[in-house]
């Protein structure tokens, strides 16, 4: 009996040579590290070294998160990934009324350069690669990181890492936007230009499908809407006067890995192929690095369950295997208790150990793209590609990613997909172990990590002290220069850096830009 994939595509019970009738491996595959990059972006992939193990972490105060980062480094992590709390993500200071009850909850609270200095204290920034999951205020956190590097004596051209900086997906799936799309895209173009000359090894954006998938997007929707956002960013940069080959090599992507390994592997391969073709044919990119879809993967948090949470260890191992077989460049494996609370030290260590077992105790790193030529994988790759391209065409027909957002297209498609999954789970058609089958009569008690509510008062005290200690006229002058740049066409990152160096807060900098650019009001198109 034919089954349906997560994207609603048929999965046949048996595949054979006839499944690939007329299929041209030279056209569809190529060699690893060569166009169209179906088999991976590098010739040797993991045969020389494994993917980067980058565990997402951050909670409470900068000092608490700093201790967690040092522990992760001691346990063998290869890169840091910073989680920020909601006030920081929304451009509010910890003592703002809108921040009440959220300070330090889902990530670390960063209000100023003072906090950033503590966050990376004792961590040499020329020895570690850092990813920061921050979007609307991404420029601020990047500049504070650069300032901390300067204090450590690290030249900016030695800083490596990534800022997420993908605001379009915030309008679609997540909601941590600040400014309307037009100034948001202008800010992203300013970041591209700034990093090209100032921080050349920095990945300036991580175009993200993960959050759409967590909101309910199917694999085909995930890559279609993510690549459509990527096209919008490339068009914005080109319209701002940049040559595509000057910035495209620093673009990166971020996807989810579900437990459905076959379709996930097909999804990753299809995404690489589509992006390479778009960059070559639509934008005329000539640098091979401009054609490469490099991506980070995080295992699917939405598939983790609060019931029998230890079973999540198994889910995460399966998800991580799919990401590796699909050719990810870096990977975060979720902790088993994340459906309940922030990870404990033990659960975070087990999540990292899961990757280490995959890398060092299996043979998946022995050969490049082990599924190449598989009847089922190649057929599913073609099917996912066709479904994604169809969705991308529909986005283009609505005026591109921004036009489709204004019509509510992506959000509507994702909500329909999420509703289907919820219906199937409620009916029992979709089995979730421990939730609608194989339940326990009584759940075993589990003590989660709890964030101290006193953190909010501590951050407020730090802010009050900062405001009395700093040179207020210097802050005011820097914020005035920032607003002038925002009103005109000058790159806003230079005056923004001056303001942050003078100890202006995240809230103050974002409020200065709010005065000029306004704030985004969501569409009620559907």
Regions found by a protein language model. Give the residues of each.
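Poly-acidic low-complexity segments
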Residues: 76, 124, 155, 166, ...
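Flexible glycine/proline-rich, aromatic-decorated loop/lid segments
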Residues: 243-247, 285-299, 307-336, 343-368, ...
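Generic secondary-structure signature for well-ordered alpha-helical cores
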Residues: 78, 121-125, 150-155, 189-201, ...
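Flexible, glycine-rich loop/tail regions that form catalytic "lids" or insertion modules at the edges
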Residues: 3-22, 31-37, 86, 338, ...
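Extended, hydrophobic alpha-helical segments in both membrane/secreted and soluble proteins
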Residues: 141, 230, 253-279, 295-310, ...
């Amino acid at each position: 009996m034919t089954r349906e994939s997560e994207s609603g595509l048929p999965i046949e019970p048996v595949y054979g040579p006839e499944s690939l009738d007329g299929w041209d491996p030279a056209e569809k595959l190529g060699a690893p590290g060569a166009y169209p990059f179906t088999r991976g972006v590098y010739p040797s992939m993991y045969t020389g070294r494994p993917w980067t193990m980058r565990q997402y972490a951050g909670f409470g105060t900068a000092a608490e998160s700093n201790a967690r980062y040092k522990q992760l480094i001691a346990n063998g992590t290869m890169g840091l990934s910073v989680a920020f709390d909601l006030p920081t993500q929304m451009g509010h200071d910890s003592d703002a009324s809108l921040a009440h009850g959220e300070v330090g909850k889902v990530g670390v609270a960063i209000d100023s350069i003072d906090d950033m200095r503590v966050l990376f204290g004792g961590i040499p920034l020329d020895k570690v690669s850092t990813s920061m999951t921050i979007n609307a205020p991404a420029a601020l956190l990047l500049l504070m990181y650069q300032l901390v590097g300067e204090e450590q004596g690290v030249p900016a051209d030695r800083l490596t890492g990534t800022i997420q900086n993908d605001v379009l997906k915030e309008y679609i799936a997540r909601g941590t936007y600040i400014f309307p799309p037009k100034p948001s895209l202008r800010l992203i173009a300013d970041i591209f230009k700034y990093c090209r000359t100032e921080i050349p090894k920095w990945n300036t954006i991580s175009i993200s499908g993960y959050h759409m998938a967590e909101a309910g997007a199917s694999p085909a929707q995930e890559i279609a809407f993510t690549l459509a956002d990527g096209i919008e960013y490339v068009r914005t940069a080109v319209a701002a006067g940049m040559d595509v080959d000057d910035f495209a090599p620093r673009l990166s992507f971020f996807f989810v890995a579900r437990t459905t390994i076959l379709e996930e592997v097909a999804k990753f391969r299809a995404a690489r192929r589509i992006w390479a073709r778009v960059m070559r044919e639509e934008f005329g990119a000539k640098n091979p690095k401009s054609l490469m879809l490099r991506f980070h993967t995080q295992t699917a948090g939405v598939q983790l369950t609060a019931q029998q949470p230890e079973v999540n260890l198994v889910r995460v191992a399966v998800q991580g295997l799919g990401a590796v077989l699909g050719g990810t460049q870096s990977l975060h494996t979720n902790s088993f208790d994340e459906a309940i609370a922030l990870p404990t030290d033990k659960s975070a260590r087990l999540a990292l150990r899961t990757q280490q077992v995959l890398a060092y105790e299996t043979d998946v790193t022995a050969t490049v793209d082990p599924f190449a030529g598989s009847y089922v994988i190649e057929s599913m790759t073609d099917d996912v590609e066709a479904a994604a391209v169809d969705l991308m065409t529909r986005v283009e027909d609505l005026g591109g990613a921004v036009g489709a957002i204004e019509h509510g297209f992506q959000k509507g498609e994702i909500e329909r997909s999420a509703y289907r999954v919820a219906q199937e789970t409620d009916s029992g058609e979709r089995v979730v172990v421990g939730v609608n089958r194989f339940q326990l009569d009584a759940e075993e008690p589990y003590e989660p990590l709890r964030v101290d509510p006193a953190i909010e008062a501590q951050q407020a005290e730090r802010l009050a002290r900062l405001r009395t200690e700093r040179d207020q006229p210097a802050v005011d002058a820097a914020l005035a220069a920032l607003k002038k740049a925002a009103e005109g066409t000058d790159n806003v990152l230079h005056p923004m850096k001056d303001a942050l160096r003078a100890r202006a807060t995240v809230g103050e900098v974002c409020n200065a830009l709010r005065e000029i650019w306004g704030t985004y009001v969501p569409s009620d198109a559907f």
